[in-house]
């Protein structure tokens, strides 16, 4: 139910995080790279720290808290909203419409 992803790489996006959120999993990750943009406002974030000992301590504390609170009513409401939002936002229909609009605008600029 929880996707524990203590990333130390500045990713530009994360398909695994998107798929996890679409499945209704809570994502616990760092705020490095575009992970915040990919997972916000639903992800649970740990501030990235180049001191990996500090990062490990902070991440472990945050993950334990997420495990403890996962089944709370408040968190389950958040997970349901997350799943619904991600499945609408990242569906093939939504993506294809975005590309269509992009190309339509590009054609209009040439005219």
Regions from the PLM with identified roles:
Residues 1-12:
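Acidic donor-binding loop of glycosyltransferase active sites
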Residues 12-13, 55:
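Secondary-structure boundary/capping motif
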Residues 13-14, 91:
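Active-site helix-initiating loop/hinge in glycosyltransferases
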Residues 17-22, 33-37:
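Short alpha-helical segment that forms part of, or immediately flanks, the ligand-binding pocket
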Residues 26-29:
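Short hydrophobic beta-strand element within catalytic cores of glycosyltransferases
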Residues 57-58, 72-110:
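A charged, aromatic-enriched C-terminal amphipathic alpha-helix characteristic of glycosyltransferases
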